[in-house]
Amino acid sequence: INKFYVFDLTAKKSMVKYLTDQGFSVFITSWKNPGEDLSGIRFDDYLLEGVDEVVRVATEFCKVPQVHLVGYCIGGTLVTTYMAWANKHYAKDKLPVAHWTLFTTLTDLSHPGDIDVFIDEASIGALEESMAKKGYLDGSEMASSFRLLRSNSLVWNYWVNNYL
């Protein structure tokens, strides 16, 4: 889930190759799978030490005043939040992002889409309790929810092929 290499699958299926062939410099960051050691990291840390730092490094490296920023999935939610922050933090003529694009990004969190079937008070409570104990959301827990959304191909197919 949410892996950077979706933009660089093969030489013939690579947005990275396409963009570099067009003369763009491409920088990709990816989430580190969290563990207990990262339980103190908060969302604003991802904004300031993640996105804002990446934008700063990219503008310096390329010697340009602005970059184009792309967010994928939850990274797009982070980019959306970053852009709201940046528009308040930077003067309009000093904004380091010229354009931004989102792929498969949920921006209206009041309508979460198909995953809504798993969201109720009890499931949120259980998730919050688990995260309070561990200090982070284990990727396997998130992956389980996504597998259930595609149960025919990601769950039952395994059972049919291996046990029936």
In which residue ranges do the predicted regions lie?
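Alpha/beta-hydrolase active-site loop
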Residues: 40-61
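Alpha/beta-hydrolase-fold enzymes
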Residues: 56, 60, 64, 78, ...
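Beta-sheet entry/capping signal
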Residues: 1, 18, 23-27, 57, ...
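Short, glycine-/Ser/Thr-/acidic-enriched flexible segments
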Residues: 1-2, 31-34, 53, 74-75, ...
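Short, surface-exposed "cap/lid" segments of acyl-processing enzymes
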Residues: 1-36
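Alpha-helix capping and helix-loop boundary segments enriched in small/acidic/polar residues
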Residues: 6-10, 38-46, 69-70
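Gly/Ala-rich beta-loop-alpha elbow adjacent to hydrolase catalytic centers
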Residues: 71-75, 79
